[in-house]
Curated annotation (Swiss-Prot):
Coiled coil regions in record: none
Biological process (GO), any one: response to X-ray
GO CC terms: cytosol
Pfam family, one: YebG
Name the UniProt record assigns to this protein: Uncharacterized protein YebG
Gene that encodes the chain: yebG
Superkingdom of the organism of origin: Bacteria
Lineage: Bacteria, Pseudomonadati, Pseudomonadota, Gammaproteobacteria, Enterobacterales
Length: 96
């Protein structure tokens, strides 16, 4: 018999993602918290968006927080390697 530990991120009663590592589950949960905050903030934007568009943009911005932070701090895009690595990490985490 095999025993498997699984960490599940649940939002509003819905399973969002499961992980084998508590650290990864906590990071994903924190990213979802950030996306929720961004979604709330974007509702005050002068740009009108459908709810689905705003939610997708909020999630994407939260996923890209390191790149966004670099842009806001330096006024420049990070090197293509950093941007590419961020996208690859996101693809890998969604495959889990």
């Amino acid at each position: 018999m095999a025993v498997e530990v699984k960490y599940v991120v649940i939002r509003e009663g819905e399973e969002k993602m499961s992980f084998t590592s508590k650290k990864e589950a906590d990071a994903y949960d924190k990213m979802l918290d950030t996306a929720d905050l961004l979604d709330t903030w974007l509702t005050n934007s002068p740009v009108q968006m459908e709810d689905e568009q705003r939610e997708a943009l909020s999630l994407w911005l939260a996923e890209q927080k390191d790149v966004l932070s670099t842009i806001l701090k330096t006024g420049k895009l990070p090197s293509p390697q950093v941007v590419g690595a961020e996208s690859e990490e996101e693809d890998a985490s969604h495959a889990a």
